[in-house]
A protein has these predicted regions:
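N-terminal Rossmann-like FAD-binding beta1-loop-alpha1 element of flavoenzymes
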Residues: 28-54
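Conserved small/polar residues in nucleotide/adenosyl-binding loops
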Residues: 178-185
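Extreme N-terminal leader/targeting segments of oxidoreductases
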Residues: 1-29, 47-48
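A conserved short coil-to-beta-strand element within the FAD-binding core of flavoproteins
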Residues: 148-161
């Protein structure tokens, strides 16, 4: 299977039913951002039966790399979410690190795997691959509602939760991130 060009993928804005609701729709979990942390969080919660709305103000995955090195613990979490091996297969694994000042090595560390560990200490992998693999996994998860071109523009604390104002290409809408139980029930 050839690599998907995740940098070239674009996601169309889709108007959501929440935008037509007469009262602010309620959600228990809203994740802001479809980067590595947001998608990992959404997948982990969704796998535990929690419905998650993911809002991202962009129309594409990352086109650069703000994150490029991922640790063993992150890989273990991604294993649990079904994408760990794919990340390792694509990335560059390493256990020994060296720090240089000009031509001189000033520090060296060795994080070779301990007995029973299945993953390398680190992998280097461009962020758009990490996001792409997580995105593909999230698309298969019925508990994740991923909304592109939805930007959180306002957050107001309320007695029963938090009111979010979300800007979209078709105008703003509001939803309630509620505490349980909500007095608005």
């Amino acid at each position: 299977m050839g690599d998907i060009d995740f940098q070239a993928m674009e996601f169309a804005y889709e108007k959501h039913a929440d935008q037509n609701a007469g009262t602010a729709p309620r959600h228990q979990v809203v994740v802001v951002g479809a980067g590595p942390v947001g998608l990992t969080t959404a997948l982990d919660l969704a796998r535990q039966g929690v419905r998650v709305v993911v809002l991202d103000d962009d129309y594409r995955l990352s086109t650069g790399s703000r994150a490029i090195c991922f640790s063993k613990r992150t890989l273990e979490i991604w294993d649990r979410l079904g994408v760990g091996q794919r990340m390792i297969d694509k990335g560059v694994s390493w256990n020994v690190g060296k720090v240089f000042f000009r031509e001189q090595e000033v520090w060296r560390f060795d994080l070779l795997p301990e007995p029973g560990h299945r993953r390398p200490a680190f992998i280097n992998l461009q962020q758009y691959y990490a996001e792409g693999y997580l995105y593909e996994q999230a698309r298969q998860e019925p508990n994740i509602d991923l909304r592109w071109k939805n930007k959180v523009a306002g957050v107001v604390q309320a007695d029963d939760g938090v009111d979010l104002t979300i800007d979209t290409p078709e105008g703003p809408y509001t939803c309630l991130l509620y505490t349980s139980p909500s007095p608005r029930d």
